[in-house]
């Protein structure tokens, strides 16, 4: 059977002067970072582009690695997110690598109460690093890292093992 790749990124150029890049990210799936970067690189060839609108409304989140990778496209350095749990293995920090793909251009991130998890990590980290203005409603508030423990009957139990924190130390539940 053929594997179908789900497109999680839509984009268009907006504005009277066609100088705003609009990117709608529906979820943080396996290849979202590659799709997202392709759009950003295409937009950056447009010399008139003055800034970006990144729409995360009703984005339920997805893979932590994708949230980190996509956030990293807009930061030169610094912490993106950390997890803190009772066990040492559940406590980790994730950092940006050098290289802002849009060279400091302004960003507006749109969120609502349907924006959760990875969306909150992305929006919160850009806000903490003063790279974006967040507009919309309060986000969903899913600040927990969960693990599924298999049960003998074939089912599973979801257990919160740690919590996500922004560079400022605030929980991502507060985005």
Where are each of the predicted segments found?
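Cleft-lining beta-strand/loop regions that shape enzyme active-site pockets
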Residues: 1-152
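Unusually extended, aromatic-enriched hydrophobic runs near protein termini
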Residues: 69, 161-164
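Short Gly/Pro-enriched loop/turn and capping motifs at secondary-structure junctions
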Residues: 116, 164-166
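Short acidic, Pro/Gly- and aromatic-enriched capping/linker segments at domain boundaries
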Residues: 151-162
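Conserved functional hotspot residues or short segments at active or partner-binding sites
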Residues: 167-175
